[in-house]
Amino acid sequence: MTMLKDPSKKYRAFPTIDLPDRTWPSKTITQAPIWCSSDLRDGNQSLIEPMDSEKKLRFWKTLVQVGVKEIEASFPSASQTDFDFVRTLIEDGHIPDDTTIQVLTQAREDLIARTFESLRGAKKAIVHLYNATCPSFRRIVFNQDKQGVKDIAVNAAKLFVKYAAQQPDTHWTFQYSPETFSATELEFAKEVCDAVIEVWNPTPEHKIILNLPATVEVATPNVYADQIEWFCRNINRRDSVIISLHTHNDRGTGIAATELGLMAGADRAEGCLFGNGERTGNVDLVTLALNLYTQGIDPQLDFSDIDGVRKVVEECNQLPVHPRHPYVGDLVHTAFSGSHQDAIRKGFAKQQEGELWEVPYLPIDPADIGRSYEAVIRVNSQSGKGGITYLLEQEYGISLPRRMQIEFSQVVQGETDRLGLEMTAEQIYKLLQKEYLQANAPYALVSHRLQEENGSSHVQVEVSGEGETTLHWHGKGNGALEALVAGLPVNVEIMDYNEHAIGAGTNAKAAAYIELRVAGGRPVHGVGIDENITTASFKALFSALNRSLSQQQAKAA
């Protein structure tokens, strides 16, 4: 079978919502929602190999450490393992006073009774009821009309009241999800939820949660936002209801749907860390939280050690986080492109502590989430001088002059093309050594002697020449470099000179950079590093001289 030329024969567009006076497009998110993690329930049930109790407890502790205050821990009536895990959390004291355990149940009395039994002894708990409400489920899965679906929800809601009353020492919060809400007629979704509200009789002081899932993502995020705004406007006793979102990512817009849903009036967001969940996954709570953070809003979740969180999630889920995953992927703070690297390097150079973050291409400071800057710029065949310069500066304290950046980037480019691989900072430094610091032929500086007399500099140098000959050159000038140039056997013109310290204190070294021309040829650069600045400058001159002469010989050959 192939894709249809006319997909309208098989698929139909989801109808738009008639909401001409919608207000959500002009709203902004100004505070974090109530967060609920479903990693241990929705996320766990979607794994090829569900977590064992040890992994579940490790994941639970990570969620608590991050700051998630409502955690859906299991489906206690589904298995003894899930039931026992809830008991472990309660009996062994793993639920902090500021954290609420949430569990899920279907709408059958035996399952509801088992669910409430699993929570015996909990200080507080959210019990989550659901049944599907959309036309396709009513028709295909349950063979129920609207009244039948509504009756299922109402009868189960009454059972919640019954079983909660048997454990009066627990502070109960009831939650209802019209599963497949986003594919359900809005009027009917409201009708069912209003009926549940009447049974549970919430107040502004003791609210219930209405969770409105995009169980399967069926439309663009703006449609979901319209549904949420319509629902918030029309549901009964809105002041006694927490509106919760539970989006999936079937169309790739779960994040956007949740953000627009919050703009449309929702109070709460359910999801999983890094977007695990059925099919294409639940909405990613990490991305949602850090999207808020980068807009200057406290997300009320702490991802200061995001790689530590990722490690736990990957090991428990046995699923890798994609290298391009927002904020946490291995490559998301990495630039290979030359123009990107140059902009980032300049941004870091100008960024001051305490100022608004404005480094190009980096929407978040990697340090805020526990990332180092080492992987921000990496060098491959697409890289330019900015990335190379940044790595040398950060790792080795070497600040190449601008024109030398251009020259050396061509050397690196040739090497990456030859290797067909990325180059590390160490490899780049070794290439710098080979190309410049070890450029000792045809002339190698052995020693030098400098005397100052009557404002003039006198230089004597011992040089190892070709064929292991020893040469002695003498020169005089207004400074050490000018004196050395005067003593050279070839005509040399210094075009540019730069120097700086590497490190500080007794271990500091000097780096010198020279750009020169030999006999009117093209400019060539040299580098010298030494504890003594004069020696470093002499080494830089010999580096450039030898490179120029070697290039001339190669061209002549």
UniProtKB/Swiss-Prot annotation:
Keyword terms: Amino-acid biosynthesis, Branched-chain amino acid biosynthesis, Cytoplasm, Leucine biosynthesis, Magnesium, Metal-binding, Transferase
Q: Which SUPFAM superfamilies match?
A: 2-isopropylmalate synthase LeuA, allosteric (dimerisation) domain, Aldolase, post-HMGL domain-like
Q: Which InterPro entries match?
A: 2-isopropylmalate_synth_dimer, AIPM/Hcit_synth_CS, Aldolase_TIM, IPM_Synthase, LeuA-like_post-cat, LeuA_allosteric_dom_sf, LeuA_N_DRE-TIM, PYR_CT
Q: Which GO terms describe its molecular function?
A: 2-isopropylmalate synthase activity; acetyl-CoA C-acetyltransferase activity; magnesium ion binding
Alphabetized PROSITE patterns for the sequence: AIPM_HOMOCIT_SYNTH_1, AIPM_HOMOCIT_SYNTH_2, PYR_CT
Give me the residues that bind Mg(2+), please.
D42, H246, H248, N282
Catalysed reactions, as listed in the record? 3-methyl-2-oxobutanoate + acetyl-CoA + H2O = (2S)-2-isopropylmalate + CoA + H(+)
Task: Tell me its cofactors.
Answer: Mg(2+)
Gene Ontology biological process terms from the UniProt entry: L-leucine biosynthetic process
EC number, as in UniProt: 2.3.3.13
For whether the record's keyword set contains Lyase, the answer is no
- What compartments host this protein? Cytoplasm
Q: Which residues form the Pyruvate carboxyltransferase domain?
A: 33-307
SMART domains xrefs: LeuA_dimer
Show the NCBIfam families listed in the entry.
Answer: leuA_yeast, PRK03739.1
Q: How does it assemble?
A: Homodimer.
Q: What is this protein called?
A: 2-isopropylmalate synthase
Q: Which gene encodes it?
A: leuA
